[in-house]
Amino acid sequence: MFKRLIPLLALCVCASALAQPQPTDARLQQLANDSYWLSLGHYETGKLSGWRSHVDDPKFFLAADGPNQPAAELSATLTALYAPASLGDRHAQCAFPARTRWLRAQLQLQDLPQPACAEFATWYQDIAPHSAVLIYPAAYLNSPSSMFGHTLLRIDQADSDSNNTALLSYALNFGAFIEGSDNSMLYAWKGLMGGYPGLFALVPYREKLAEYTRLENRDLWEYRLNLTPEETGR
């Protein structure tokens, strides 16, 4: 019985090796040092040496040392891309579409599993990105902190201009998450020195428009970005 299992186990090992490519260490290190991969992980050089990521959410990383090791995160991502498609929305391809797209192109990954990614597909279709507009709200007189500037991106659909439907677009916003009631001195210090955590938020543009123009009476300056639909979709 044991002898008959040996060829079967060997076949399984070979099939697994064929399913997931094994790039050389040099190639993996080259990709890990690529500026695009470093941007995907929001990495910057550490104060003394090495790397560190601006992202402090452990769910963003697949490797235990991912926040400080771009190469380890890349290797863990490559392994996770070949997880069973039955994981569905929990699959790495669904959680990290930008990583998936880039690694597929760089390593010619033609045999990746095909998870459904239903939640991501629904979310992406709802946004329907086609073009992007940089929005700069003017300062709010009752809030001195607004003079430091605030920008956001408006993601428009294909018919946004022709049908004048910018109100149906989405706004990609990055801002400080402030809890409690810090005094003005502490608020200014923490605001200038990065003492508040920053969060990305995707909200309907009409909500931001109401906040800035109706509630705060602020002017909005719009600058359409020279991006293709493909670039906007990324």
Protein language model regions, located:
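Intrinsically disordered, low-structural-confidence terminal and linker regions
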Residues: 9, 19-60
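Low-complexity, highly charged intrinsically disordered N-terminal segments
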Residues: 51-127
